[in-house]
Amino acid sequence: MIGCGACEPKVKMAGGQAAAALPTWKMAARRSLSARGRGILQAAAGRLLPLLLLSCCCGAGGCAAVGENEETVIIGLRLEDTNDVSFMEGGALRVSERTRVKLRVYGQNINNETWSRIAFTEHERRRHSPGERGLGGPAPPEPDSGPQRCGIRTSDIIILPHIILNRRTSGIIEIEIKPLRKMEKSKSYYLCTSLSTPALGAGGSGSTGGAVGGKGGSGVAGLPPPPWAETTWIYHDGEDTKMIVGEEKKFLLPFWLQVIFISLLLCLSGMFSGLNLGLMALDPMELRIVQNCGTEKEKNYAKRIEPVRRQGNYLLCSLLLGNVLVNTTLTILLDDIAGSGLVAVVVSTIGIVIFGEIVPQAICSRHGLAVGANTIFLTKFFMMMTFPASYPVSKLLDCVLGQEIGTVYNREKLLEMLRVTDPYNDLVKEELNIIQGALELRTKTVEDVMTPLRDCFMITGEAILDFNTMSEIMESGYTRIPVFEGERSNIVDLLFVKDLAFVDPDDCTPLKTITKFYNHPLHFVFNDTKLDAMLEEFKKGKSHLAIVQRVNNEGEGDPFYEVLGIVTLEDVIEEIIKSEILDETDLYTDNRTKKKVAHRERKQDFSAFKQTDSEMKVKISPQLLLAMHRFLATEVEAFSPSQMSEKILLRLLKHPNVIQELKYDEKNKKAPEYYLYQRNKPVDYFVLILQGKVEVEAGKEGMKFEASAFSYYGVMALTASPVPLSLSRTFVVSRTELLAAGSPGENKSPPRPCGLNHSDSLSRSDRIDAVTPTLGSSNNQLNSSLLQVYIPDYSVRALSDLQFVKISRQQYQNALMASRMDKTPQSSDSENTKIELTLTELHDGLPDETANLLNEQNCVTHSKANHSLHNEGAI
């Protein structure tokens, strides 16, 4: 038996070598491992020393083997390369299935066979808790105090049979990891190492056993060999030798194909989003409008889109379903590539917002018609693809929400749309006004556009169609004139200007004759009648003028119809075109604002159609003239045949300025021109009322009474003259002419031819007319009246339109003189007498009728004288 002393030197040597070698690999380990690795290294060194001491008990051959083949000690592992599938996590190695991983092995005496001393097991190392110790007795031997055998080595991790050495302290091995079992997401494996050499032979074992048995009393034949007599796998200390195999990260598709799909899905997402905005914004009404009035390209686009857009809910469901499907798929593919949910969400959100929402919607909102028409085939394709899901939902929406009609604008919205889009459309202001006026026609009433009754031009039914009346009608410029009786609100007839085409102003035709002959119907409307209804009435041709009335039920009494004004077709048209229609005769631009028309260069002047001064200005009927003549001759002493011949009276009444008319205005009743006489104001004329009414105020008490036709005033004014003495009529007879008159036989000059014309009687230079010497007494009588002035003590004011006779004192005195000249007998000596009458220039001029009257009288006188001389010569 080999004693232990024989082995002692070798044990010492082995211990010394181990002790000497331990610092070497410890320093190497410290340089490459962490603090935890250094702890594992010290524990491994503590285990090696007992093994080395036990090996000294072996035989000489055993000791020699130990000295020649030193034990390989594995300290730890780490990943050579890290990536997405192989990395360190929490001190453990994390790798993926179906991969090959390179590991760097740290330890002592790393050689080409080291790969065979490494294995992995699925079973975790068992650790005893302190409670497992016996109570009151010695502690049982702890397995953790020495090497602990590892469980069954796994076949899921294969150590490839090669190693790359590096200075015998580290090496690189490669392992292959097989797939995990079904339903396993991850699995943990633990590192196991082999510490003992291969088992010895029988003799060796017996010797060793005998030595040990002899030493310790247990090395007898038949006992099982010690654990280190064969290859023993033990757990490696330290958590850093734990390996976690995770599920292999599988891509749904190859990376390049996924990139293509992601790009395509982004395009589809943008298309669905853009079409959803572009097509759904084109409502069916707008598409119909574009089909009818758009350009050729727009008509083509609308024609292609309209059948699809007509199925609004079906199209909406298809586009939304496709958009959601595309966006969801895009997120899944991005998550598969990124490997992180947060990254996938951020990237997909950015991509969808920019390329799937903002850009396509910005384009389709402006060019939706073109984009929708060019992608109509894709739209139809996806509508067919999503038909099973989208069509039932669309039908449900049709039942719940009803059929889509489209955008419909009412009158107010359409007007506002025109106003808002005015800067962007090509409508001119006049066109826009006409459109607005036509749309507002139903919202306005005739009361808004009518001409109030107080501003209407109207004619009384008692009017006479003389020159003044017809001139007033023509100057008004209206073609349809209401005719009233009594009050202006009592409109009884309607006069058309064309009805006066065959009326002669000289005939003084009564207005009633014309209105009764034509009998134009009156059209009454209520004040709340809309303008569109009024336009329809005017279009029927019944009338282009209507009388606006309302039911007045204010106050006590029964309701009655109150006339408010007049509305015409022109008023309605002006509201439609939002502008005033002006013609040549308009005086105002607006019948409501009363803004006058600007001054026109050409004005209508009807003076060319007036009668001359020699004509009667006011036409009266022959019957009225006869009645007036007989009344003055029989009822008024100043015009009796004893004072004035009937012939001269008739000529006086036919004088143009004798018969006059006065138009009465109800608005200005107290105007001075309506007073024929005023109290305490001198007058020199006589007045006879023919037609109309006057009011007479007489006496200090101011008694008033009304008078009508054939009442006369101012008889005393005919015998009293307010004319100054310088302007009075004077009779001058030259001395030579008086002497010639005294001796008629001496006058041998031929008689002056008769023929005092109009120019001679009114000439400023020739103021003397011939008179006979026998008028001396009359001359004295006339001169005696020059100092008399007539001042009435009463007032006469018109109450209506008047037609009256106005004879001034000058006209009366001329008529008296003409009458006396007509009555005075002519002598034979008057043929050589020249009598000239000086007349002042009257304020209204000497009438031609008086001059003709004097000419006729002189002609008669001279003809008688010539006739007597002719008879004497014959004798």
Swiss-Prot record:
Biological processes, Gene Ontology terms: magnesium ion homeostasis
Listed InterPro entries: ACDP (IPR045095), CBS_dom (IPR000644), CBS_dom_sf (IPR046342), CNNM (IPR002550), Ion_transp-like_CBS (IPR044751), RmlC-like_jellyroll (IPR014710)
The UniProt record lists the keyword DNA-binding: no
Reported effect, E357K: In HOMGSMR1; results in decreased cellular uptake of magnesium
Gene Ontology MF, one: ATP binding
Intramembrane segments: 314-334
Record domain CNNM transmembrane: where: 251-431
UniProt-annotated location(s): Cell membrane
Disulphide bridges, residue numbers: none
Side of membrane Cytoplasmic, spans: 272-313, 335-338, 390-875
Residue intervals of the CBS domain: 450-511, 518-584
Phosphoserine PTM sites in chain numbering: S761
Glycosylation sites: N112
Pfam families membership: CBS (PF00571), CNNM (PF01595), Ig_CNNM4_N (PF25511)
Mode of membrane association: Multi-pass membrane protein
Entries under SUPFAM superfamilies matching the protein: CBS-domain pair
Pathological condition linked to this protein in its record: Hypomagnesemia 6: A renal disease characterized by severely lowered serum magnesium levels in the absence of other electrolyte disturbances. Affected individuals show an inappropriately normal urinary magnesium excretion, demonstrating a defect in tubular reabsorption. Age of clinical onset is highly variable and some affected individuals are asymptomatic.
Family under the similarity heading: Belongs to the ACDP family.
Protein name (database record): Metal transporter CNNM2
Organism encoding this protein: Homo sapiens
Gene: CNNM2
